[in-house]
Amino acid sequence: MHYPEPISKLIDSFMKLPGIGPKTAQRLAFHTLDMKEDDVVQFAKALVDVKRELTYCSVCGHITENDPCYICEDKQRDRSVICVVEDDKDVIAMEKMREYKGLYHVLHGSISPMDGIGPEDINIPSLIERLKSDEVSELILAMNPNLEGESTAMYISRLVKPIGIKVTRLAQGLSVGGDLEYADEVTLSKAITGRTEM
C-alpha cells in the first residue's frame, strides 16, 4: 500500500527500533497521527533530548547526564569490586535489588563472532585499563546466560587472571538464554550472593 510520504517516513523510523515490525510500526504511526500536536511535539523533544543530554560515563560506560556518573562519584561504594554487565539496562536491574554496593563497567554488547562483534568492538579495552589503574580485588562477570554472554565472560576471565584479580561469575539460577534485565530482584540477589570464582 502507498502511504503519504510523512507516514512512510514515520513507519520506517519506528521500524528501526528493536522488536518493531511493519505492522506495529504502521499502528504506531497512525496512533501518532491521532495524537494531539502538543503530545507529538513533547514526544519528539523527548527523543531528541535523550540523544543530546545523555552521554556515557568516561569511567564505567553507564548512561549519565553528568560525567562521571552518580555511581562512580558515590564515595560510599565499594571500589574494590567491579561488576561487568553487557548494557545499561543490566545496571538498572542490579541497582533495583539494592544489595550490590560496588562499581560497574558496562560493555555495551557481548562478543558475537556470528554478528561480526569482537572484543575490540565492545568496552573491554577500557575495562583492562581501569583494572590496571584502580585498586580492584574482585571482578564480577554478570553477563547474560547465553552463548554470547558465556563467550564474553570466558574471554574477560582469561584476560584478567594474569593481572591477579579474583574473577567471579553470578551463580546460576538465571535462566539459560535469558537476559539479566528481566530477572527479578530475588533471583538477582541470590545470583550475586552465590557467585562462583572462575
From Swiss-Prot:
SUPFAM superfamilies: Recombination protein RecR (SSF111304). GO terms for molecular function: DNA binding; zinc ion binding. Gene3D superfamilies: 3.30.60.80, 3.40.1360.10, 6.10.250.240, RecR Domain 1. The keyword DNA damage applies. PANTHER family: RECOMBINATION PROTEIN RECR. May play a role in DNA repair. It seems to be involved in an RecBC-independent recombinational process of DNA repair. It may act with RecF and RecO. This is Recombination protein RecR. The lineage of its organism: Bacteria, Bacillati, Bacillota, Bacilli, Bacillales.
